């Protein structure tokens, strides 16, 4: 179905054709930090067109969301402009929080009474790359077959976003006593980076949401926790030389290999004697080396090597102690070498992090969302979410509950089943009813 809501948000942005950067990008007309939208662009009628064609609004929204290539390295502002227009058509005011480039933004919207804490539906709009994957369908288009919706982000997590936006539009027609909030972010896939400016905005607000449902894929089970993550880098400095005289140089890749051994040794210790939580697939904190770069060609002894690694920690894990152990291990490697190679070092730096989530299983938000879904128990998930930031920085009680499985995320031919989407729509319809009743 063709959507009359276009991809360029001209009501809020102007295309920069001036002789200065950012060239050819949409930039805010007023250059303000937050861009509000409460009136639709002229000649818009998307929701009405969907109703007339007997197509669910959710499916039409999902089709458009999947059509936007919002890989984290690319802008998402066209997608956000589309959503602002769609929400405005339903009479819903929304706010964009752009990044410094103007190419990416978070979106925040509220339906219902002002000045009352409500329920926040949270998701991200960015997706992981498709390069190098053997897709049999177009990744940036909706393909429906075998009772599944295919496309990059269908499971993680544009399927939930489409359901949440539909719920907001339908809720706008109802007399809510408790408001419904929508929070959509960028750059979640590269460290939950984008949502932090949205959290800054909420932190300064007089009233914060009462609770939050992060719609990451859990097969509609209610998840109360995930591990925290710290991304780190170790830069190994040796001394360059000709490979014919290799013993007279100091190979930085050898230093890196020794440091990887330190990481693996610490992982073995944590697995054997560290904290445990049997609710996770991997019941202990983990250390993982994901990337190693070094060397130019085979006949040059490299003087530099870089290791990117991570710690995924259980709640209560002393991660600073783990990092101290890593630094001590690095020092033990280089200390004996400094007399001959005083420049040698293994420098460890923290790149970014996000906190874990550990909502008590008897918390009000847990019981409330279980009552919406009919779930009896709870789970914890292996992947990270923005939920830990909402909890840690804003004190918002948070759970994770959304359609699909992360087993389908980040893979070629990513999909979410129609059955999972319908269960999510039913949960959100019940949520809207509860907001009308005041819970």
Mark where each language-model region is:
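Leucine-biased recognition of intrinsically disordered, low-complexity hydrophobic segments
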Residues: 2, 15-17, 48
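Metal-dependent amide/peptide-bond hydrolase catalytic core
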Residues: 51, 100, 233-439
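Short terminal hydrophobic/aromatic SLiMs and anchors at protein ends
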Residues: 12, 17, 23, 31-34, ...
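Short, Lys/Arg-enriched N-terminal segments with co-localized hydrophobic residues
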Residues: 36-37, 44-57
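Fold-level recognition of mixed alpha/beta catalytic cores in primary-metabolism enzymes, strongest
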Residues: 146-149, 155, 159-265, 410-423
